[in-house]
Every structure is written in structure tokens, then in C-alpha cells.
Amino acid sequence: MSFLFNKRPKSTQDVVRCLCDNLPKLEINNDKKKSFEEVSKCLQNLRVSLCGTAEVEPDADLVSDLSFQIYQSNLPFLLVRYLPKLEFESKKDTGLIFSALLRRHVASRYPTVDYMLAHPQIFPVLVSYYRYQEVAFTAGSILRECSRHEALNEVLLNSRDFWTFFSLIQASSFDMASDAFSTFKSILLNHKSQVAEFISYHFDEFFKQYTVLLKSENYVTKRQSLKLLGEILLNRANRSVMTRYISSAENLKLMMILLRDKSKNIQFEAFHVFKLFVANPEKSEEVIEILRRNKSKLISYLSAFHTDRKNDEQFNDERAFVIKQIERL
């Protein structure tokens, strides 16, 4: 990293200009090596300037000047555009640079959020990178950082690209599918009121696609989706969503099937959704009918359900409550 301490260090303007000049050259065969070196050096410079080091905090005035140059030059878009062309360490630096920029605020303003709102074309590109392992994880880290901000999360939720996560989660690559699920979860849990409104408006389509995840043959997909469903339904902001979901006979039937899944972990997660149907004081007639029809089987099954969890007081209390409610039907 001697370039950071040479006799004539690049100014912030020089660093940004160097990146803007060299990033497009990564697609050109002639003299690629020199462009890779320049981009690598400048990204390291940028990362150290914005993030500091273990020993030195970033200089506030330098960060302010550098950020201004970054926005003025449209560098964030260029970094996303040419992300697949970057070398491994440069991709890591890019992720850290975006994280630092997105967390930077001036009073109550987040300048990078404003920039991203003005350039929404960045989001489809980032989501599309989940198709390519070499950039998926950097793109995912940037998307999750964006989802921390309500205004950017709204853009993600209301774009067509949000719906592609339902297929990305089922990718054949475990690592890529897990990362996509982490982003999906961040989008759905970070801003509860906003997400409640979104799910309410898109209720039928959302749960049509979500049910596919719950029926997945992939153990990890099924378990993660089931656990997330419980978190979504138990959010206070999602009360109307929960009420509508637990009024459905089809949803109840699915949970009863999952209660008997061969995996004990999936059984356990299914119980935490199933209990909502039973505890609902205003059950729909179709839900009551199914519970009554299966009353004796449910009581017998739940009486022996996960009895090895002797030290889990909350679970045992809830299981006893559910059994008692079914007995009263």
C-alpha cells in the first residue's frame, strides 16, 4: 500500500477521476493489466479514506470532499456497472465503500440514499448479479445495506425485481441461495409498517409465491421460509395480515402437514405458526371445522410432540395451551 504514502499522493478528485477513466477500460482487451492495477490502487485508496484503518479514523473533511466527488462523477453507478470485471479484493473494497457511503449522514440527511433514489436503475443491476457467483455476495451486501434505509427499502419492495427473490432463494448453489434469503429477509423485516402495507396490498400474490417456498423439497429453503413466516405474522404491524392468513383453511392444512414433517426442526417451526390458528379467538368456520374434524388426532399427536424439550418452558406452556384450546372445540 505504498501508493498511499508516496511523495505526490492523488487528490480526492484524482482518485475519483482515475476510477471513472479506468473502469470502462476493464472491458477492453488492450492494456487491461494497467487498468486493473489502477482500479485496484484507487479502490484501496478510496476504502482507506472512507473507512480509515485499525489505527487511524477517517478524516471528516476528506470524507466530505471525497463523497461530493463520488456523487458528482456518478461513480457509484459505474462501480455497480463494472462490478463483475473487478478482481476479488477490489470487489471486497467496493462492498466496504458502499457500506461506508450508505452509513454516512450529514445531520439527518443521508447523501448516498438521495443519490440512490435519483438512480434507481442501480437496483435491478444489483439483483441481477445474484445469477453470477463471482459477484452475488458483494451485490447482496450492498442490497442489505440499502434495505436498512426505509426509502431505499421501499424502492426494492415496489420493484419487479423483488419478486425474483422467490426464485433466487431456490437457487441450486447453497451459498447463493442463502445470501439471497438474507437479503429477502432484510427487506421484509427492517421496516415493519412499510412491509405490512406492502403485503396487505399484494396479499394473494405474495402468499401464493411464499407457499411454494414452504412446500420446497429443499430442507434449508423450507425451514428458513417457515421461520421467517412466523416472524412476519408475529410482527404487531402485520396484525391484519396475520388475521387474514390464519383464516384460511388451506394455510391451516399446510401447517398441519408441516407439523408432521420428517424433520423435527421443521415440525418445531410449523408449530409456532400452527398455534396462531388455534389461539385465534375469531376463527373462521372452515378453520374450526378442520380442527374439530381432526381433534382427537391433533390432541394425541401434540401430547407426544417434542417432549424432549423439557427445559423449554415457553414451548411447553404453549403446547399445553394449544392442546387445551383444541379440547374445548
Swiss-Prot record:
Gene: pmo25
SUPFAM superfamilies: ARM repeat
Protein known as: Mo25-like protein
Family: Belongs to the Mo25 family.
Lineage: Eukaryota, Fungi, Dikarya, Ascomycota, Taphrinomycotina
GO molecular function, a single term: protein serine/threonine kinase activator activity
Domain of life: Eukaryota
Entry GO terms, CC: cell division site; cell tip; cytoplasm; cytosol; mitotic spindle pole body; new mitotic spindle pole body; non-growing cell tip; nucleus
Pfam families: Mo25 (PF08569)
GO process annotations (BP): intracellular signal transduction; protein localization to medial cortex; RAM/MOR signaling; regulation of establishment or maintenance of bipolar cell polarity regulating cell shape; regulation of microtubule cytoskeleton organization
